[in-house]
């Protein structure tokens, strides 16, 4: 993007539709290899001028681990779910055409909707006038 924009990425480590480590997923429409999530997040850290060094742990539970880096021009947060699949955490679990390739479990105790609302509520978009 032309300016830093907050990024909040959720990903299940057992997601076989969009594998965390990259490569080809399974399910309808999977025709191209995906980049590994750690590489994509590292690219965002570079674009946003994040400081080298340790991640800051924002949340750590049995079902979720959310991290960020210090000194970025805007927030880049990653929440991973060790047993998580390709679903929206905290939503009602639904049948899906990708069910046969999902692997792990649907995350029900973490609300992605509440987390992303809280995340973006803490950011303002500066509007420039021409």
Residue positions per predicted region:
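Flexible, surface-exposed loop/gating regions in the mature catalytic domains
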Residues: 1-130
């Amino acid at each position: 993007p032309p300016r830093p924009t907050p990024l909040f990425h959720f990903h299940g480590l057992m997601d076989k539709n969009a594998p965390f480590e990259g490569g080809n997923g399974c399910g309808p429409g999977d025709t191209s290899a995906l980049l590994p999530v750690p590489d994509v997040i590292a690219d965002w850290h570079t674009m946003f001028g994040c400081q080298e060094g340790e991640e800051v742990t924002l949340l750590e539970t049995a079902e979720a681990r959310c991290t960020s880096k210090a000194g970025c021009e805007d927030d880049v947060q990653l929440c991973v779910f060790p047993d998580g699949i390709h679903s929206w955490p905290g939503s009602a679990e639904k049948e899906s055409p990708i069910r046969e390739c999902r692997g792990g479990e649907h995350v029900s105790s973490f609300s992605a909707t509440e987390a992303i609302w809280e995340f973006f509520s803490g950011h303002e978009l500066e509007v420039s006038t021409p």
